[in-house]
Amino acid sequence: MKRAGTLRLLSDLSNFTGAARLRELLAGDPAVLVRCSPDGRHLLLLRPPGSPAPQLLVAVRGPGLPLERAWPEGDPSPLDVFFVPWLARPALILVWESGLAEVWGVGMEPGWKLLQSTELCPDGGARVMAVAATRGRLVWCEERQPGVKDQPEQLSTAFSHRVCFKTLETSGEAGTKLGCTHILLHHCPLFGLIASRKDLFLVPTTNTWSGVAHLLLIWSPSKGKVIVAAPSLGLSHSKSLNPKQGDTWDFRTLLRGLPGFLSPREPLAVHTWAPSSQGLLLLDLKGKVSLVQCHGGTRTVGILQEAPVSLKGSAALGTFHGTLACVLGSTLELLDMSSGRLLEKKVLSTDRVHLLEPPAPGMKNEEELETRGALRLLSALGLFCVCWETPQGLELPSDKDLVFEEACGYYQRRSLRGTQLTPEELRHNSMFRAPQALASILQGHLPPSTLLTTLRAELRDYRSIEQLKAQLVAGDDEEAGWTELAEHEVARLLRTQLTGDQLAQFNTIFQALPTAAWGATLQALQLQPDRSGRLRSQAPPDVWKKVLRAPTAGKEHPNGILPPFELLCQCLGQLEPQWLPPFVKLAQQQGGPGWGAEGPSLPLYRRALAVLGEEGKRPEALELELLLGSGRPKAVLQAVRQLIKKEEWERALEAGLALDASSPLLRSEIFKLLLAEFAQHRRLDAHLPLLCRLCPPEVAPHELLLLLRTHLPDDEGTTPFPEPGAEPPLTVGLVRALLEQTGAQGRPSGPVQSTYEDILWDPGTPPPTPPRGPTASLPASDHPGQEAWVPPGQGLGAADVGVHL
C-alpha cells in the first residue's frame, strides 16, 4: 500500500464575509490576482484594469468587515496589492504605476481605514514597473526617464531602471507606515520582483534586454548580500551589500566584475515563477520545473507530463511536505521533489484554481493541526487542502531501510549464489559498500559545515579565477594575468576526464600559452629532478592515468587535437628538450596495465617520437635518448646501431653495460654487434676494456673465436705484416684479453672442452730446456717438414707476429 494524495474541503466560503461576491469574482475572471494574509484569515482579490466594480475585494473569515474598492473608468487601478507580513494587525499596501502607495489597516474600530498615502517616486518622471513586499520592506523597480536631475548621464533604454525599497514601520495607533527610501540597484534592466519569506528574487521579464535576460539576482536582507545567478551556466556569485549603511550597486559595474556571466546565452524561457520555502520555482515552456535555491544554485525538480501550451495559459506552483504541486489548467500533478517522480495526477472540475501560500509560522488559525504545512487551493467551490493520507496501521520504512531493500533485490538478480540475500546481510557485509554509502548519505552523515570545509579549496579557487577575469577585463597587467589564468585552467582541466571539449580546451591553452600551461602541468604532476638527473613525481595515479590515456584505436582526433601525453611531449620538446627523455622514462614507470585505449596501443617512446616529426627529420640526439631510455629491446638495438654507424663506440658500449641482469639476451646481442666491428677494424681497440666487461660470462672461448672468424675481413694478405698505410689486422694479443674474460669465473675442472683452452689456462711455465751438447744433424729426408729448433730469446714470439685467425 502507498500513501494517497487527497483533496480535503476546508471551507465552502460561507464563513467569509461577502461570500457571494467572493464566489462571483473567483468564478468570473480567471486573471484575478489572489493573495492570502499571513494569518490565513483574509483573502484578497484584485481584478485587472478595465474590470467592472469592485476591482478590489478583501474578504474576512469570521467576524470583521470586508473591504471593497472601485475606481472610476479612466482612473488607473493599482498595479499590485500586498498584505503586510509579520504584523499582528492586518494591513494592506496598494501601489500604482505612477508611484502612489496607500497603506490600509484595521484599527481599534471595526472596518478598514486609510493609514498613509505617499509617493514612491516624489521627483516625478518615473513609473513603477514591478513591486513586492518582503520581511518588513516594500521593494519596487522603477523606470527612470532620461533627463532627470539626479542622473549624472544619459541612460540607455536597456539600463534605465533602478530598484528601491522602503521600510515598513509600526507607528502606535496608526499601525503601519512607510519609512525612508533606499536605493538597492542603479542602472539595471527591467526586473520582475518575487518575494519569499526571507529573500527577494529579481527575475528577467519578456521586456528585459536579451543580453542579461539569462541572469537573475537574489537579495538576502538578513545576510546583507546580493547573489547574481545564471541558471543556464550553472554560475552564481555573491556580493556583500548593506543598504542601511549606504551601500548600493551599479548593475553595469557589478557585471563588469563577473565576466564569466556574460557568455552569450538564450534568455530564460520561463512560463511561471513561484516562491517556495526552499527558494524560487520556475516552470519553462517544455514542462520542466527547476528550483533556484537561496544560495544561487539551480537544480531540476521534475518534468510535468503536460507542458504549458503558451505564455498566456494559467499555471500555479507550490510545495508541501517535500512534494511539488502544479496546477496547469484543470490538471493537478504531484511530484516528489527529491527524485522528480510523478506521485499522482488529478483532473479537477474547474480550471480556475489558485494556490495559496501556507500560513506564516507561529500564526494562529482555526484549521486542524494535521493540515499545517499542507497546500491550499482556492476556487469558487471552496477552500481545499492537498495532503497525504497514510492508511492506518501502516508504518512507513525509513529511507535507510528502503535503500537496503532495493539493493537486496538488485544484487539478488545478479548473484550466482543459490542462497537468498537479506537486507540484514547487506547491512553487515562489508563487501557491499554501495548501499551502505547511499544509506549514510541519506542519514545526513555530512553536515553543512563539513561539506563547506570540503569545498572551501574549490570555492577559493573559483573566487580567485573570477577576480582574475575581472582584472583582465579591466586591462591590468595582462601578461601576468593571462599566465595565471592559463595555470588555473590547466589545473582545472587535469581534474576532469580530458575528453571531448575539455581535451580541445587543453590543446588550445598549450598552443596559446605553452610556458604557462607547462608550468601548471609541472605543478599538477609534482615533477622534481633528483641529484642523478632523473625526474620524480608524487602525483596520484589518477592524474597519470588521465595523462597517459592513449587515443582510441582507429579514431584520430580532428583538427590536430592531440591526446594529453602527446601534447605534453610536443610542448616539452619545444621548451626544454633535454627533459623529454626523463619525462618519457618517468611516464613508463607510472603507467599501469589497462591504461591505454581498448586494444593494443603504441609504447610511450613511440608516441613521443611521433610528435617530434617523421623518421629522418627528428633531432638525432633526442631520438637516441628516447630509444635508449625506452627499455624496449628493438628500440635499444636500433639506438646502438645508430651509435655504431656514427662510431660513438664508448656510448654504444655504455648502453650495453647499463642493462641489468634482467636483459641478458639484449646485452648479448649488443656484444655481438660490437664484436663484429672489433673483428673488422682497429678503431675499437682503445675501448677494449669496456668490450671485455660487456662480454657475457657464459660465452665459451671456442664460441668467441668462431664469432670473430665469422666477421673477419676476407681481403687479408698472406704476409705476416700489413702493407704500409693499411689498417693492422687482429692479433692474438688483442684476442687474449677477450679469451681471459670468458674464463673469468675460474678454469673448469675435468677434461679440456676446447682445443684452445690449454692455451688460455697455460700458467706460463716454459718447456724444459734441451741439452746444450752438440747434436748430430739429421738428414732432412728423415724428418721431412721438421725445422730446426730455435732457442728461447732468438727469433720471433707468437705474440709479436701478426697471426691471421
Swiss-Prot record:
Biased composition (Pro residues): 764-773
Localisation per UniProt entry: Microsome membrane; Cytoplasm, Cytosol; Early endosome membrane; Lysosome membrane
Region (Disordered): 743-805
GO biological process, alphabetically ordered: blood coagulation; intracellular transport; lipid homeostasis; lipid metabolic process; lysosome localization; melanosome assembly; pigmentation; platelet dense granule organization
Pfam families from the UniProt entry: HPS6 (PF15702), HPS6_C (PF20468)
Domain of life of the native organism: Eukaryota
Disorder cited: Defects in Hps6 are the cause of Hermansky-Pudlak-like syndrome, a syndrome characterized by hypopigmented eyes and coat, melanosomes greatly reduced in number and morphologically bizarre, kidney proximal tubules secreting lysosomal enzymes into urine at greatly reduced rates, platelet dense granules deficient in critical components, such as serotonin and adenine nucleotides, leading to functionally abnormal platelets and prolonged bleeding times, and mast cell granules undergoing unregulated 'kiss-and-run' fusion at the plasma membrane.
Function: May regulate the synthesis and function of lysosomes and of highly specialized organelles, such as melanosomes and platelet dense granules. Acts as a cargo adapter for the dynein-dynactin motor complex to mediate the transport of lysosomes from the cell periphery to the perinuclear region. Facilitates retrograde lysosomal trafficking by linking the motor complex to lysosomes, and perinuclear positioning of lysosomes is crucial for the delivery of endocytic cargos to lysosomes, for lysosome maturation and functioning.
Protein name: BLOC-2 complex member HPS6
Source lineage: Eukaryota, Metazoa, Chordata, Craniata, Vertebrata
Gene assigned in the entry: Hps6
